[in-house]
Amino acid sequence: MENPVIIYVISDAIGETAQHIIRAVTAQFSLNKPADIRRHAFIRDESALLETLEEAKAADGIVVQTLVQAKLAEYATNFCVQNNIPNVDLLHTLTAAVEAKTGLKSKQDPGNMRRLDSNYFDRIAAIEFAVKYDDCKDPRGLLDADIVLVGVSRTSKTPLSSFLANQNWKVANVPLVPEIPIPAELFQIPAERIIGLTTTPEKLAQIRKVRLKSIGLDEASSYSSEKRILEELEYGYDTFKKLGCQVIHVEDKAIEETAALITEIITSYH
């Protein structure tokens, strides 16, 4: 089909759960155009819900709902059935199963998933930590980090730091440049807290050329030259060996996949 698949996320909270699942599902299809995901969050009454459902009907879309309140979920399901709209309820099949197994009733409180508890504030602190100690802005932060990522330029250190921070990990990262000495603090922390990131010369050259082009610089710069890349990668391997740290190849891996490998390694030491 030429037009993108339109998917309406309807939630009485933020709607992140549905959005993550939709992206995982649509990634399995060779779509001509990316799915058009339209998120409608904090739908807490029937009038707002009806307005969104009418919009989904007019757009010939798919409805994916994460409505905690059973009354609203039932309303949405009935509307979709009556109007022949594909509808997926991500919460209530599992909710019913848990109720049947435990004998307990769901609280049906949409805000319960996002309470400002200690976990929330820990996550905010981790995000602030990742920003403060990104790119080794202050080497002293390495001593307080749960995870330290080390690698040459364009090996996903910053995006991985951000992703892991959202999982409550305090992450610092250190760029490896042959001309710049390694901070002494890196040798003062346990090797099991350090993860080396590397990639293939071909992949690194490709990524660096794209980066140079995006900022209007010559793709033939030494930054993306084969000689320079091989020199940096070799320096990286020498550094990993000195540190005695685990090493992950990031080429052709999604950030989520690499992050999962990192947390698996880190938690295996505890």
Swiss-Prot record:
Catalytic activity: N(tele)-phospho-L-histidyl/L-threonyl-[pyruvate, phosphate dikinase] + ADP = N(tele)-phospho-L-histidyl/O-phospho-L-threonyl-[pyruvate, phosphate dikinase] + AMP + H(+); N(tele)-phospho-L-histidyl/O-phospho-L-threonyl-[pyruvate, phosphate dikinase] + phosphate + H(+) = N(tele)-phospho-L-histidyl/L-threonyl-[pyruvate, phosphate dikinase] + diphosphate
Binding-site positions, ADP: 151-158
Signal peptide: none
Pfam family, one: Kinase-PPPase
Taxonomy, superkingdom: Bacteria
Keywords assigned by UniProt, alphabetized: Kinase, Nucleotide-binding, Serine/threonine-protein kinase, Transferase
Keyword Nucleotide-binding: yes
Top enzyme category: transferase
EC number(s) per entry: 2.7.11.32, 2.7.4.27
GO molecular function: ADP binding; ATP binding; phosphotransferase activity, phosphate group as acceptor; protein serine/threonine kinase activity
Family: Belongs to the pyruvate, phosphate/water dikinase regulatory protein family. PDRP subfamily.
Function, in words: Bifunctional serine/threonine kinase and phosphorylase involved in the regulation of the pyruvate, phosphate dikinase (PPDK) by catalyzing its phosphorylation/dephosphorylation.
Protein name: Putative pyruvate, phosphate dikinase regulatory protein 2
Protein source organism: Listeria monocytogenes serotype 4b (strain F2365)
